[in-house]
Every structure is written in structure tokens, then in C-alpha cells.
Amino acid sequence: MPSLEAVEAFLVMNESELLQDFLVGLIAAPQLAVFFEKYPRLRKIIDREWPGWQRRLRKRIHDTNVPDDLAQEFTLYQHQLLLGSGEFFRRLPATLAALDSQGSPFSHKAHQLCPDGKITHSDSFHTLFLQQWRLSLVARTLTLHHQVMEQEREMLQQELQQRMQLSGALEPVLVENENAAGRLWDMSRAPTHHGDYQLLVQYGDFLAGQPELLQLAERLGRSRAADPQDHADTQLEIRRVLVREPAVMPEEVSGIHQSDEILRLMPSELSLLGLSELELEFYRRLLEKRLMTYRLQGDAWREQQIQHRVTYRHHQQQPKGPFIVCVDTSGSMGGFHEQCAKAFCLALMRIALADNRRCYIMLFSTAIVQYELTADSGIDQAIRFLSQRFRGGTDLARCLAQTCTLLQQPTWQQADAVVISDFIAQRLPEETQGLINQLQKQDGHCFHAVAMSPHGKPSIMKVFDYIWRFDSGIKGRLLRRWRH
């Protein structure tokens, strides 16, 4: 059974134009126009979806088979095209009967062209019959095409509305620039429920109410400057220069010299011809080109192309490395500590989206749970992370050991390791401390400690490059509220 794509191609229908009209109509929907006015950043991002939509629609058309009755009529039409004029007229009654039995919409028009079985055996009738039949097939194919496109339109509009609703709700929380808006839009493909992403919105509101926590995340997230890289590029270039050389037509006297140029003889040489005794001497010197003559010459300038090597040095900023965030989920980190830790991770996720970095979360207590908030399914993983409850023990050493294992892989070059904890834990093993020290000195990795309590153990925190303190206790909260 032929596909819709094959029938359209045989009938010489412009599929690209049909798809273009469909997509233009989709974007011009009133619901989308209102949304684009509210979130103009997403309008540019939608344009990137066109190639994917076109591939999706073409695949749907390719996979859609035409109905049996249309397939039978299309096959009959193809056979008629292969017949000569005489054979066509001989089989015409059988063709009309086949159209009647198939219930073809063209059957009525075919009988109108052959009233009472009277058929004019001419090439013009043959051509007219096939043209009218083709028009009927094109109309049926277009109807089927529009039905398929209408189904796709409904699914695409529903998908777009869900993604735009999600992107619009999370834009104030996660979007800082155009790059972040594009990555959020790509992440919105993963299915999520309305009630789920509201958790992200709630923590975004909480973060907005804690400006010191947000500022701390900004300072930590952008504390490492992007490493510049010099790139030398040597190539051959053509340089045009002006070269001075003697002119073909002399312009001025520049001295005297020996030559045979009669027109430039000095008067003393001409005097030799006046004495018969010296006349032979004159001719001898003429043959030897030893006559004293004026030297006349001028300057001319000519453009000359010279090839030379030129080295260009490009100073290019390299992208920053990813975040590996270790979050303490022990019981002592519950309550307000838990809210602050989750909001801090959300702020780092926002920075990672804006700076095109990865944000990898590791929850450590008695077991280690991992999430990547900037993956394609990052929104779903962020929701699952925010839904976690902090009720376990503390195994900081195990988490740091696993972090060091990750940092030794090429994927995690220039990564920043961030540990969010109250740092009320057991002393780190000497082996782990030595490994951290090696990663800091040899590989340039930075280890940050975000202390949620003023009672953290100094013996643990001394291994970190930077210590960022945020007092999430009652006293710290009261002081921050009093300042504001």
C-alpha cells in the first residue's frame, strides 16, 4: 500500500510548501502570539525548532498509508497512464465500471465526460480524462494531508503550550541570559506535571527572599575566571608594494658614461670629427662603445606583489568547568538548613545554565544519590532533588572520595567542587586529604565549602580553597531580618 508521501510525490504536489504553510499557521496561533509578547526571549528560540518539526512532519507523512479505496484508485490511475491511446479507449468501459465499484468521487465526473457511453476517440479526450482524474486524486490526497496535519497541529500545539507554560513559569527562577533561555527550552521537552515544577517556583521565591544567599551563590559561582587560551595561526598573505625602477623614457641628466649613443654625445667627442687625423679614432671608440655621453634617466613606480608569512594570535576565553555540588542530607541539616541548601543549589543551576556549564549534585548521608540538573531531563531531576528529605547520617569522607574520582576524569576538567554542610562530621582520612591536595595543586581544581553553621570543625574545613559562611541558624536569620 503506497504511503501518503509516495502519492504526493507521484502527483507532483509541493510537499515543502504545504509543510511551510502548516508551520506558519501553527506559529501564528493566537495563544502563541500572546505568549511571545509576554516572553520575547522565547520567540527567537522557537525558530530553532522549525527543522525538527519539519523532520517530524515528513516522517509522519512518510509513515501514513493512504486508505484502501484511494490506494486502489491510485493504482488504477497509474495503469491508465501507461496505456497507449487505442488501448485506453478499449479499456475505458471497464475503467468506468471499476470507478463505480470503488465509489470514487471521480466516477460522476467520468460519466459526464462520456454521456450515454458516447466516447470521442481523440488524443484531446484522452488527455482531458486523465487531467480531470488527476485533479480528483489531488483533491482527495490534499484532504487526507490536511487531516494528518490537523492531528499533528493539535499534538504540537498541546506540546508547545505545555513547554511554554513550563518555560514561562521557570524563566524568573532559572533564566539569566539568552543562553539560559535556550537551554531551559531544550530541557522543557521532558514531560513534567504542573504540580511538580511548582516546587521549583516555590524554591525560587524562597531564594528571592534570601538575597544574601543568592549573592553568596553568585560570588562562588563566578569566583573562577575563565582561563584564556592563546592560539597562533600562521598563513601566507600577499602584500602589494611600490617598487622604484628606471623609466623607459629618460627625464633628466644624472651624469656621464661611456656608450655608443650618438644623440647624447658630449661636445668634446663631437670635436673629434672636425679633425681628419682623429676621425678614425672617433669611429673606433664608437664601435667599442667608449664615447663619452650624457647619462639620462628617470624614475618609474611599479606595483609588485610579495608573499610573506603572517602569524595571528587569538586570545580566546575557554568555557568554565562544571559544578560538582555535594549536599549533606544528615538530620542536622533539616528544616531551614535544608531549604537554604536546596535554594543554593538552584542558584548554582541558574549560573550553570547562563554560563553553559554542567551542574552535578551528589547527596551524601549513609548513601550517595546523584542528579545532573543541566541534563536534558534536568527539570525532572531538579524536582526529584528538591523533593528529597534530609534525615540521614553524615558520610562526608565517602562523598569527597567519590568527588575526587570524578575530578580525575577528563570530562571534569576545570571543575569546581562545592560542599554544602554544617561540617559537623568525623575527621577526613589522610588519604582523602592528600588526594584533594593533589587535585588542587596539580590539576587546578577548586574546592569550596559552604558552611551552614558556625560550629563546623576546622580540621575538616582546612582542606578547602574557599570557605563561604551562611549562618542559617535562628541568630543569623534574625540578624538578616533586622538589617532589612
UniProtKB/Swiss-Prot annotation:
In terms of CDD domains, this protein maps to: VWA_YIEM_type (cd01462)
Instruction: Tell me how this protein assembles.
Output: Homodimer. Interacts with RavA.
Keywords per UniProt: Chaperone, Cytoplasm
| Cystine pairs | none
GO cellular component terms given for this protein: cytosol
Upper lineage: Bacteria, Pseudomonadati, Pseudomonadota, Gammaproteobacteria, Enterobacterales
Which family does the record assign? Belongs to the ViaA family.
Where in the sequence is the signal peptide annotated? none
NCBIfam families (alphabetical): PRK10997.1
Compartments, as annotated in UniProt: Cytoplasm
Q: What function is annotated for this protein?
A: Component of the RavA-ViaA chaperone complex, which may act on the membrane to optimize the function of some of the respiratory chains. ViaA stimulates the ATPase activity of RavA.
What SUPFAM superfamilies would the database entry show?
A: vWA-like (SSF53300)
Supply the name of the protein: Regulatory protein ViaA
Q: Which InterPro entries has this protein been placed in?
A: Uncharacterised_CoxE, Uncharacterised_ViaA, VWF_A, vWFA_dom_sf
